[in-house]
């Protein structure tokens, strides 16, 4: 990991709104981060007073796992770096965090041909290869039955997104702008690739590809399906690494995306904060980041070779998931449908009783702001801006 330039945004004193949140996740994503990375983050950024206990426990767990992290790299590092995706282009699921990417990923994960990042490997990424045979059953007993933000069922083997383990080993990820909320340059540089140096871009490419190599090694297959909303505006960068990659993009009504993402920020992401941002700042971030992510995807999707992109509408996928999966396999020319269709059908049968969260009505000022700032999103996929008629 190469150390990038220090983010330019300076810490500010921001005490508007209480730091109280309905925390739902006790563990921090950085508990098994690389020691060098965690020390660099602490050197570059201030941890606000309400989160110093959280920082203390990160330091403790990082210290406890340091030897085992070193041992995993010594045993598996060289083997992982030999893995190539030249003849096994990944399938990338793109879309906003709250647009149905998890539902789509869960369906794909039932295909016995495909490997994917599991929750176990996500949570214990830097020691997962070393410990999966004996620690995974232990972790399974302590995992919650559902995700805090949406009540989706989870277990140690359920699919997860690879930006999370990337944040444990690399500075080159926008997730650090979640942890250190005033440091938005991580999002700008490593999600939107704005103001990024060639050295930093090369660092992101190396670190990201190595995460995929580790996922492949863990699964015993180079055929991967990956769900990562942070990748949505990275089409160009992904094609530079994997020119024959397949893409599935899922979109949802923008009002629902906003409400669900704000809920995600307050129920789950806030439990990872190391710097305070107010609830109003969270709303600003949902709108501004959503606009940037979607608009960069729209500008870049034409770069994807014909036949390598399928776009899916969430409300249709929700009602006719099996038919949509069959269409995706056919349009992308994916092999193995005959073996996958049974397990995929079983998955959709298993989630028939699932109930989505219900949210309070949008404030009028937010409704108007979403109409204005997300206009391109409404127009591109033909969503109505009338809340009374939304589909």
What are these model-predicted stretches?
Residues 71-93, 122-126, 131-134:
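N-terminal signal-anchor transmembrane helix
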Residues 94-96, 225-229, 314:
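Short His-Asn-centered micro-motif
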Residues 110-120:
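Post-Walker A helix-loop "phosphate-sensing" segment adjacent to the P-loop in P-loop NTPases
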Residues 232-235, 255-258, 318-321:
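Flexible loop/turn segments at secondary-structure boundaries
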Residues 93-110:
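Glycine-rich phosphate-binding P-loop
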